[in-house]
Curated annotation (Swiss-Prot):
Gene: bgaP
Class of enzymatic activity (EC top level): hydrolase
Amino-acid positions noted as binding substrate in the UniProt annotation, renumbered to this chain: R112, N150, W316, E356, K357, Y358, H359
Regulation: No activity lost during treatment with 100 mM EDTA after 2 hours, and the addition of 1 mM MgCl(2), 1 mM CaCl(2) or 1 mM MnCl(2) has no effect. However, the enzyme activity is inhibited by Zn(2+), Cu(2+), Ni(2+) and Co(2+) to different extents. Addition of Na(+) or K(+) slightly stimulates the enzyme activity at low concentrations and the optimal concentration is 250 mM. A further increase of their concentration of ions above the optimum value results in a decrease in enzyme activity. The enzyme is still active even in the presence of Na(+) or K(+) at a concentration up to 5 M.
The protein's name: Beta-galactosidase BgaP
Organism: Planococcus sp. (strain L4)
Annotated SUPFAM superfamilies: (Trans)glycosidases, Class I glutamine amidotransferase-like
Temperature dependency: Optimum temperature is 20 degrees Celsius. Lowering or raising the temperature from 20 degrees Celsius results in reduction of activity when ONPG is used as substrate. Rather stable at or below 25 degrees Celsius, but loses 58% of activity after 30 minutes at 40 degrees Celsius. Loses all activity in only 10 minutes at 45 degrees Celsius. Exhibits 27% of maximal activity even at 0 degrees Celsius, but enzyme activity decreases with a further increase in temperature until it is undetectable above 50 degrees Celsius.
Length: 676
C-alpha cells in the first residue's frame, strides 16, 4: 500500500486554509471533514510566497498549525512543496525564472506553471525549500506522502533553455557529425558546424503553430529535452526530500494524456503515480477508462493515486456542467476499479476569489454540510471506511495490451503530412473503445514493457519504431502472440529519419506486407472495407477514412479489400502467420462497427474472453488480490439495467448482499462483486 499508516482507500483532497484568515472557518472545515469521512488533506500546493516572503526568510508556523490541527482530528497530510508558482519577489529580483513563450515573448510575473525549468535561480530555490520542508516535517506522523510541485507542464524557449538544449544535444550525440546525420541537416542547408549555431525551435525558427515543423528531428529532440528539463526539476526536489524521509513516498500529479511530457519516463522517478481526472462534458466514458488504465500502466500495473477530481463542476472547460447525482460516486469507483487506491478532490473548500472560485468543492460557498454534493462525498467516505483495506494493492490482470508512446505521438503530430486530421490519441482510443464495449480488460503499456505476459498486443499508428522494438514484436509473435498495427506504422526511426526499403520498415517481415503508397482524403470522404467471405464476427462491408495504405501481400493473407477508388480490390486488412502467432495490419482508419467485430474476432481466436456480458452503457473492470477477484459493474446509463450474473455466486461489497442470476443495477449504480 502507499503508506500503511492509513490502510484504506484514502479520501480527501486539496485544502487551502491560507486563503482564509478565520479560526471559525478553519474549525468548521475540520468538523465537516470528519462528517464527510475525509482522512487526507493535500496542503501547501501554492504557498511558496507565504512560506518564503523574501530571499532570506522562511515561515512555516502557519503550516505547523494546520498539519497539527488536522492530525489531532484524525486527518493526515499529503504535503506539497509549494513550488508550482514562484513568488513575485523572485521574478522581480531574478528575471531568469520567467519563461519565454513559443512566440519569443518573455513572460512577466503571473499565473502559474510560469517558471523556466533551466533557470539556475528557480532550481536553487525550489530545491532549497523542498529541503527545508522535508527537514522540518521528516518525523511528523501526519505526513503520508510528498507532493512535488503541481501539474508540471509547458515549454520554455529562453536563452537558458537554448544553452541547456545544446548541452543536452552534446551529451546525446557526442559530435555534430552524428547530430547532423540524425537530423538530416543536409536538407535546406542546415548543417551545423558549432553547437552555438543551434537555436530553440519555436515560431522564430523552425516551428509554427499546431505542431508544424520544418525539421521534425530538431522539434522532436526539443520536446524530449523540455520533458527531461522539467523532470530534472522534479528530481532535484525528490532527492532533497528523500535524504530526510527515506521511507515516505514521493509523487507529483500527472494529467492523463497530457501531450508535453513523456510520462513513462517520469513514472520511473515516482514512487507512486498520481493524476488529475477532469473529463469534459463530451468525454466518452471509455476515454476516461483508458486514461486510468494508462496511468496504471506507467508503472507496470502498480495501483495509482487519483490526486484530483472535482466533486461537482470545473471552472475552465467551455461548458462547466454539474456532475449529476450519483456521477461523482460512479466515477470514483471507475477509478478504483481500474487501479486507484485513493480518491482525492480539488477542492475541499471552494475559493472565494480568482479563477477557481467557481470550481466545485466539498464545502460550497454557503459553508455548511446541507448540500447535495457534500452528502454524496459523505456517502463515499462512509463506503470507503466500510471497505477498509479489502481492495488496496489489488491488481488488474489483462491479457490484451495497447501500446502508447509519447515520443511516437510527438513524431506523428510533427509529421509534415500526409493529413492534418491524423490524431494519434484518437486512433489509440478507437481501438480501446472497441475493447471497452466488448468488456475486455486492457493494459496500456509503453514500448519498454515485456510483451510475453499478453495474448494480444495492439500498436495503433506505430509511426516511430525504436531500436530493438521490431525484434521484440517478432519474438512475441513467433512465440504465439497476436500483434495488430495499423496504417502509418513502421515509417521512421527515433530521430524521425525514414526507414528505407519500403513501408512498414522494420515491421515488414512480421506483417508480411509492403505498403507502396499512402492516400489521404478529407475526413468526410470514405472508402469501404469489404470482407472476403467471413471470419468470426467479420462479414460484409464497413466504412473507413482518413488514410489509406496501398499494400501488397508478401506472405500475408488478405482478409478484406478496399471497395472503391483506383485501389479497389487491394488489401485493407491482412493477417500473417508468423511462427506460432499472427500479425494483423489494418491499412485505414475504420469505423467503430468494424473495430468491435474485428477485435471480437481477434480475441476469440486468441482465447480472450469478456469479463461479463452487459448492456450498452454498463462498464466492467476487475481487480485481483490474493486470488480473490473483485468485479466492478458500473452503470453509466440513466435507467436501471439488468445484469446477468449467470450461475455465479457473488457478495456485493457495498450492500453486503449475496447476488446471483439476473439482478437490477440502478441508474449510475455500482456493484463490487466478490466471487463466493
Amino acid at each position: 500500500m502507499i503508506n500503511d499508516k492509513l490502510p484504506k482507500i484514502w479520501h480527501g483532497g486539496d485544502y487551502n486554509p491560507e486563503q482564509w484568515d478565520s479560526q471559525e472557518i478553519w474549525d468548521e472545515d475540520v468538523r465537516m471533514f470528519k462528517l464527510a469521512g475525509i482522512d487526507v488533506a493535500t496542503l501547501n500546493v501554492f504557498s511558496w510566497a507565504l512560506n518564503q516572503p523574501n530571499e532570506d526568510t522562511y515561515n512555516f508556523e502557519w503550516l505547523d498549525d494546520k498539519i497539527n490541527r488536522l492530525y489531532e482530528n484524525g486527518i493526515y497530510t499529503c504535503l506539497a512543496t509549494s513550488t508550482a508558482a514562484h513568488p513575485a519577489w523572485m521574478a522581480k529580483k531574478y528575471p531568469d525564472v520567467l519563461r519565454v513563450d513559443f512566440y519569443g515573448r518573455k513572460r512577466k510575473f503571473g499565473s502559474r506553471h510560469n517558471s523556466c525549468p533551466n533557470s539556475p535561480t528557480y532550481r536553487e530555490y525550489s530545491e532549497k525549500i523542498a529541503d527545508k520542508l522535508a527537514e522540518r516535517y521528516k518525523d511528523h506522523p501526519a505526513v503520508l506522502i510528498w507532493h512535488v510541485s503541481n501539474e508540471y507542464g509547458g515549454y520554455c524557449y529562453c536563452d537558458n533553455c537554448q544553452d541547456a538544449f545544446r548541452v543536452w544535444l552534446s551529451d546525446k550525440y557526442g559530435t555534430l557529425e552524428k547530430l547532423n546525420k540524425a537530423w538530416n541537416t543536409g536538407f535546406w542547408g542546415h548543417t551545423f558546424y558549432e553547437w552555438d549555431e543551434i537555436v530553440a525551435p519555436n515560431m522564430l525558427s523552425e516551428e509554427r503553430e499546431d505542431n508544424v515543423s520544418d525539421f521534425q528531428g530538431i522539434s522532436l529532440d526539443y520536446r524530449r529535452f523540455q520533458s527531461d528539463s522539467l523532470l530534472d526539476c522534479y528530481k532535484l526536489e525528490y532527492n532533497a526530500i528523500r535524504k530526510h524521509t527515506p521511507n515516505i513516498p514521493i509523487t507529483t500529479n500527472l494529467m492523463g494524456t497530457y501531450p508535453m511530457l513523456d510520462y513513462f519516463k517520469w513514472a520511473k522517478e515516482m514512487d507512486v503515480v498520481s493524476w488529475d481526472n477532469y473529463p469534459a462534458i463530451d468525454t466518452p466514458f471509455s476515454y476516461t477508462a483508458m486514461t486510468h488504465d494508462l496511468m496504471r500502466g506507467l508503472k507496470s500495473g502498480q495501483p495509482f493515486m487519483l490526486m484530483e477530481q472535482t466533486p461537482s463542476q470545473q471552472n475552465w472547460q467551455p461548458y462547466n456542467s454539474l456532475k449529476r447525482p450519483g456521477v461523482m460516486r460512479l466515477w470514483s469507483y471507475q477509478a478504483i476499479g481500474r487501479g486507484a487506491d485513493t480518491i482525492l478532490y480539488f477542492q475541499l473548500r471552494r475559493s472565494v476569489g480568482a479563477c477557481e472560485k467557481y470550481h466545485g468543492a466539498v464545502i460550497e460557498h454557503v459553508g455548511h454540510e446541507h448540500t447535495r454534493v457534500f452528502n454524496e462525498v459523505a456517502q463515499i467516505g462512509k463506503e470507503f471506511n466500510q471497505l477498509g483495506d479489502t481492495l488496496l494493492d489489488a491488481r488488474v490482470n489483462a491479457r490484451v495490451a495497447i501500446v502508447f508512446d509519447w515520443e511516437n505521438r510527438w513524431a506523428t503530430e510533427l509529421s509534415s503530412g500526409p493529413s492534418v486530421s491524423l490524431d494519434y490519441v484518437n486512433e489509440v482510443h478507437k481501438y480501446y473503445d472497441a475493447l471497452y464495449k466488448l468488456n475486455v480488460q486492457v493494459d496500456m503499456v509503453g514500448v519498454e514493457e515485456d510483451l510475453s505476459q499478453y495474448d494480444v498486443v495492439i500498436a495503433p499508428v506505430l509511426y516511430m519504431v525504436k531500436e530493438g522494438y521490431a525484434a521484440k514484436v517478432e519474438s512475441f509473435v513467433e512465440n504465439g502472440g497476436t500483434f495488430i498495427t495499423t496504417f502509418f506504422s513502421g515509417i521512421v526511426n527515433e530521430t524521425d529519419i525514414v526507414t528505407l526499403g519500403g513501408y512498414p520498415g522494420e515491421l515488414r517481415k512480421v506483417l508480411g506486407i509492403w505498403a507502396e503508397e499512402i492516400d489521404a482524403l478529407h475526413p468526410d470522404e470514405t472508402n469501404e472495407i469489404v470482407v472476403n467471405g467471413s471470419r468470426g464476427s467479420l462479414s460484409g462491408s464497413y466504412s473507413c477514412n482518413l488514410l489509406f495504405d496501398l499494400i501488397h501481400t508478401e506472405g500475408a493473407q488478405a482478409v478484406a479489400e478496399y471497395g472503391s477508388d483506383f485501389y479497389q480490390g487491394m488489401p485493407v486488412l491482412t493477417v500473417n502467420e508468423f511462427g506460432k502467432g499472427k500479425a494483423w495490419y489494418v491499412a485505414s482508419s475504420p469505423d467503430a462497427e468494424f473495430l468491435v467485430d474485428f477485435l471480437q474476432t481477434v480475441c476469440e481466436e486468441a482465447g480472450v474472453e469478456p469479463l461479463l456480458s452487459v448492456p450498452e452503457g454498463v462498464e466492467t473492470t476487475e481487480r485481483v488480490k490474493d486470488g480473490q477477484t473483485y468485479l466492478f459493474v458500473l452503470n453509466h446509463n440513466n435507467k436501471v439495467e439488468s445484469i446477468d450474473l449467470k450461475d455465479s455466486q457473488y457478495q456485493e461489497l457495498l450492500s453486503t448482499q449475496q447476488l446471483s442470476g439476473t439482478v437490477e443495477l440502478e441508474a449510475k449504480g455500482v456493484f463490487i462483486l466478490a466471487k463466493v
